[in-house]
Amino acid sequence: MKLGDLEFWLLTDGTFRLDGGAMFGVVPRSLWERVSPPDGRNRILMAMNSLLIRAAGKWILIETGAGDKWDAKSKDIYSFEGSPRLPEKLVARGIPPEMINIVINTHLHFDHCGWNTRLVNGEAVPVFPNARYFVQQGELDHAKAPTERDRASYFPQNFLPMEKSGQWSLLDGDAEVVPGVELIRTPGHNRDMMCVRMSGGGKTVFFFADLIPTAAHLPYPWIMAYDLYPLTTLENKKKWIQQAAREGYLVIFGHEAENPAGYLREKNNKYALEPVELDS
């Protein structure tokens, strides 16, 4: 899809499953299972969506999926599926990892930065050797010293190698990495997660990351139990849902498997997705 001089494509690193109760927090299963049917282990299906962007003469990748550094037990817990994986999809488009100039991690949970690195002779090394990796300074600091509540979401192999290679570009607040691609600190899920806004040609696209992970999470109180600051999530959901609907943003969800993109339509102060197909 083109936005003026900017062009982007929706990619995915496949699907995985997480517990539906954890994904919908205080919402009763009798409600959420109508829109996200669970499997026999109470897990719902989710995608790991990424965006490939061409802007200002650079190749930019937003999110790097779950990667492949998983043991058999973890693969069973999360039921990773999908082939080819993200790096192979880039190569199929004629974009080998060496061509990526910028990698944006909205945050450093394992399902958003897994292909930051891969194992070579047992050592995790950057997949994108010529890229600058962007994340909030506060998120990297927290990832290196997480709490007991969220420690399982962070894998040091996904982010420490970029310190060794000197590839981190650390942010302190909002930033425009190239003209038309803006990173917006949006706390709630954690303190320093970011959403991404792309603009050009009179159009705007908003990538929700984990602020609103799926279309089923559009109702204001449908907030993940994983969120460290749920009331802040609530405030930011209201702000960005209303703004996206009012200004006609095309929105993209980080984990929506069925209808990952579309426009928000409001009726009686409730919002629904009008899905659209994107190039992939």
List the model feature ranges, each with a label.
Residues D13-T15, T64-G67, L108, G138-E139, ...:
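Active-site metal-binding loops of divalent metal-dependent hydrolases
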Residues D76-E88, G201-S280:
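Cap/insert and terminal regions of metallo-dependent hydrolase folds
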Residues W9-L11, I104, F134, S169-L171, ...:
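Hydrophobic/aromatic beta-strand patches that form the interior of the parallel beta-sheet core
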Residues M1-I95, M99-D111, V127-R185, N190, G202-A209, V276, ...:
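Metallo-beta-lactamase
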